[in-house]
UniProtKB/Swiss-Prot annotation:
Protein name from the UniProt record: Ribonuclease PH
Source organism (scientific name): Hydrogenobaculum sp. (strain Y04AAS1)
Gene assigned in the entry: rph
Annotated NCBIfam families: RNasePH
Keywords: Nucleotidyltransferase, RNA-binding, rRNA processing, Transferase, tRNA processing, tRNA-binding
EC class of the enzyme, as a word: transferase
Reactions listed under catalytic activity: tRNA(n+1) + phosphate = tRNA(n) + a ribonucleoside 5'-diphosphate
Length: 255
């Protein structure tokens, strides 16, 4: 048994608080257990140089952690003058996940900036960031549509992420920091609400794993992502086949 009597195949308690930031076009606070991330989406009426004149938008992400989001204080990367490799990896993952579920040709020549700021870290910060980023992004795009700046909400599906690992020879879902630190194998799965995979990162930490173990981790993660998609869907009325997404008045959802 794990902390708080959590089962091996059980997600941590998840909570999403929408409109957490009063300024951003879309925002939320997402919590996975003790991990807390503020996600915002901001709209810029411009695109990167490689997209100018192509009548296509872009979505990109930045990720950071507050100095005391962890057990000991870390220097801000802005102070060190260098963005770390882990930060680059995570923010690119967030951006790819968002772009996977939207038709960028239908949002005009504008950029949606996703900012994910970890205020407390206890494992799974990248997965929580992706789950929250989707809510922030979708709300921002719905706002564009409501303002008649675009004529549809071209989002195909929800997208979420979860971690799975092998800890002390046991398969575990949604690892906290202690579990992740002791994992022999660690996997991060990014997938849409209908189970189509966007990205899988799987690696052995000074260990190897079998194809059977890989498939077991993948199955466990994909099954849990159905629950996460259901949580995200609480916030919307949607018919993706006709590019229709509307906000419900829901401000908070829990799992």
């Amino acid at each position: 048994m794990r902390k708080n009597n959590r089962k091996l195949d059980e997600l941590r308690p998840i909570r999403i608080q929408r409109d957490f930031n009063i300024h951003a076009e879309g925002s939320c606070l997402v919590e996975f257990g003790n991990t807390r991330v503020i996600c915002t989406a901001s709209i810029a009426e411009s695109v990167p140089p490689f997209l100018k004149g192509k009548n296509q938008g872009w979505i990109t992400a930045e990720y950071s952690m507050l100095p005391r989001a962890t057990a000991t204080r870390n220097m801000r990367e802005s102070v060190t003058g260098k963005i770390g490799g882990r930060t680059h990896e995570i923010q690119r993952m967030i951006g790819r996940a968002m772009r996977a579920v939207i038709d960028l040709t239908k949002i005009g020549e504008r950029t949606i900036w996703i900012d994910c700021d970890v205020i407390q870290a206890d494992g799974g910060t990248r997965t929580a960031s992706i789950v929250g980023a989707f809510i922030a992004m979708t709300d921002a795009i719905i706002k564009l549509n409501e303002q008649k700046l675009i004529n549809s909400v071209p989002i195909r599906d929800t997208v979420g992420a979860v971690s799975v690992g092998i800890v002390n020879d046991r398969l575990m879902l949604d690892l906290d920091f202690e579990e992740d630190s002791n994992a022999a194998v660690d996997m991060t799965i990014v997938a849409t609400g209908n189970g189509e995979m966007v990205e899988i990162h799987s690696l052995g930490e000074e260990a190897t794993y079998t194809r059977k173990e890989f498939e077991a981790m993948l199955d466990l993660g994909l099954e849990s992502l159905k629950q996460i998609a259901e949580l995200q869907n609480v916030f919307y009325e949607k018919m993706p086949s006709i590019n229709l997404w509307k906000r419900k008045s829901v401000k908070e959802a829990k799992l």
